[in-house]
Regions:
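N-terminal [4Fe-4S]-dependent radical SAM core
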Residues: 1-27, 72-73
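Short, ordered coil/turn segments that flank beta-strands lining enzyme active or ligand-binding pockets
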Residues: 284
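Flexible mid-to-C-terminal extensions adjoining Fe-S/redox cofactors in radical SAM and related proteins
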Residues: 295-394
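Cysteine-centered iron-sulfur cluster-binding motifs in ferredoxin-type domains/subunits
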Residues: 30-37, 85-88, 276, 332-334, ...
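Radical SAM/AdoMet-radical enzyme domain recognition
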Residues: 63-80, 89-212
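Canonical Radical SAM [4Fe-4S] cluster-binding loop centered on the CxxxCxxC motif
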Residues: 20-57
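Radical SAM enzyme [4Fe-4S]-AdoMet core and its adjacent flexible, acidic
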Residues: 150, 154-162, 169-276, 281, ...
Length: 394
């Protein structure tokens, strides 16, 4: 029996190559399909209209291949589900995915799942599934009613805030932790404190702020984000977080990333990693790309439903110039915040080879690094810093 026949039977084969290092793959089972009509969405409307759901054969081949491609020493394999709105794939789709994960998971390997949703379609059945299988949930909510309904309406232009809040309340009722993802653009740049306060008021303990950067040909007229506004917004969040005494109580991923990267030399975010290319994305038809922000022919790696193993496709992504040349510019090399910035996301680099948010990152990172520089960049340094912070808080 040859390799193609074994794949057809969905049997893991030891002869398949494994990746040299763990890699992540973000899956879009419904592609651009969504029940909201966010005014800044980077998916063109025509792409949202022609999307289709991933079929069961491709789902099975992907799960089998993704598990088989990870290094033998991997002790956890994470599946990331995103959209569009991934809940549109239906609860049965994820039940099948979970069954396939159990079927192909090697002994001693933990399988985990993360899913990003707008929260409006959540119900008790979804929450029971997520709770039972320990899903890590992200919920997209840009702010209070005024902000959310203005920038993230439904397909008919109507309000979405109440539906999103109902979804969040369900997660809390089922005792499911969630990360609140908020998009930052010039239209909300002067509302950082109010947006932070609202997130905390609705019970969110894990927050993440994502800069809006226009990509492709999406109809995002009137939206943008200047470097100055990005830096101003994040500095305001940082100061609010400190002034309210939320250290150790509310976790802002943009802040935690700096702390982690300073003391461990490793970034939890591909945006600020020294190299990227280890976070692939798969469309519902099986096309694999090197990055969620680089969905174009230049960064197409291949197809998951064809005969090239995923480990081989992942190796191609790791060797692409965009991931290796992030911070090679002379200005980056001598920048005082390079250790936690690393040039930012390559998709946000302009024709002048500067990251369009450079000045904002510099202002934000400089403020966070100032009190850290007195401590060694080591686990021991982290312990000393935490002790000092605790003493001050006490």
């Amino acid at each position: 029996m040859n390799l193609a026949q074994l794949r057809a039977q969905q049997i893991p084969v030891e002869s398949e190559p494994r990746a040299a290092a763990p890699f992540h793959l973000l899956v879009k089972p419904i592609g651009a399909g969504c029940n909201l009509g966010c005014r800044y969405c980077y998916y063109p409307q025509r792409q949202q209209e022609r999307t289709r759901k991933m079929d069961d054969d491709l789902l099975a081949e992907f799960i089998r291949g993704y598990i088989a491609a990870q290094p033998r020493y991997s002790r956890e394999i994470n599946f990331v589900w995103q959209g569009g709105e991934p809940l549109l794939a239906g609860i049965g789709f994820y039940k099948r995915a979970l069954a396939l994960q159990r079927r192909y998971a090697p002994p001693g390997v933990r399988i985990s799942n993360s899913l990003q949703t707008n929260g409006t379609l959540l119900n008790d059945a979804w929450c029971r599934l997520f709770r039972q299988h320990h899903f890590i949930l992200g919920v997209s909510l840009d702010g209070d009613r005024e902000v959310q309904d203005a920038h993230r309406p439904d397909k008919r232009g109507g309000a979405s805030y109440d539906a999103a809040l109902r979804g969040i309340a369900l997660l809390q009722r089922h005792q499911i932790d969630f990360n609140l993802l908020m998009v930052v653009h010039d239209g909300v740049a002067d509302r950082a404190e109010a947006i932070y306060d609202h997130a905390v008021a609705i019970g969110a303990r894990y927050l993440q702020f994502q800069p809006l950067m226009l990509e492709g040909d999406a109809p995002t007229a009137g939206y943008g984000l200047s470097a100055a506004n990005w830096g101003r917004f994040m500095l305001a969040v940082y100061r609010r977080w400190r002034s309210r005494g939320h250290i150790g109580q509310v976790f802002v991923m943009n802040i935690e990333q700096v702390y982690a990267q300073y003391f461990t030399h490793v970034s939890p975010s591909c945006v600020h990693a020294e190299r990227c290319g280890g976070n692939l994305v798969m469309e519902p038809d099986g096309r694999l790309y090197a990055c969620d922000h680089l969905i174009n022919a230049q960064h197409l790696l291949g197809h998951a439903d064809r005969h090239t193993p995923l480990a081989t496709l992942a190796a191609r992504a790791a060797e692409m110039p965009f991931g290796k040349n992030k911070s090679l510019r002379r200005e980056c090399q001598r920048c005082s915040v390079k250790s936690v910035c690393q040039g930012g996301c390559p998709a946000h680099v302009g024709e002048d080879r500067y990251n369009r948010l450079c000045a904002g990152y510099y202002a934000f990172f400089s403020a966070l690094l100032a009190p850290l520089r007195a401590y060694p960049r080591s686990p021991q340094g982290a312990m000393q810093w935490r002790a000092a912070v605790s003493a001050t808080a006490g």
